[in-house]
Amino acid sequence: MKARALVAWNVRRIRVDRGIPQEQLAYDAGIDRSYMSGLERQAENPTIDLLDRIAGTLDVHLSELFVQPPKGATTPKPLPKGRKPARPRRKKK
């Protein structure tokens, strides 16, 4: 599996395992939700700094984003749809 695919698979797996909506992870990492979606679909090529920020937001070591999935592992299922929580407002600088 290529690096971009590993990162995509692991970010999604960790996020879904912890019940974190994609929008919330993107907000907490300081990136746009559409970019996070692209990252999970292997459409984006994130920098090492961004991967470090995402790993920190997920509270895992950066190396966890490059772990090979077990043989026969399937793509994590999406979180159940439902009402989205209100997004917190960003503080003005």
Residue ranges and their predicted role:
Residues 11, 25-26, 36-39, 65:
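Conserved hydrophobic/aromatic packing and binding residues within compact polymer-binding modules
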Residues 17, 28, 39, 57:
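Residues within the alpha-helical elements of helix-turn-helix
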Residues 67-93:
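Short, charged recognition helix plus adjacent turn
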Residues 9-25:
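Short basic helix-loop element that most often maps to the first helix and adjoining turn
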Residues 50-55, 65-66:
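Hydrophobic micro-packing sites on short alpha-helices
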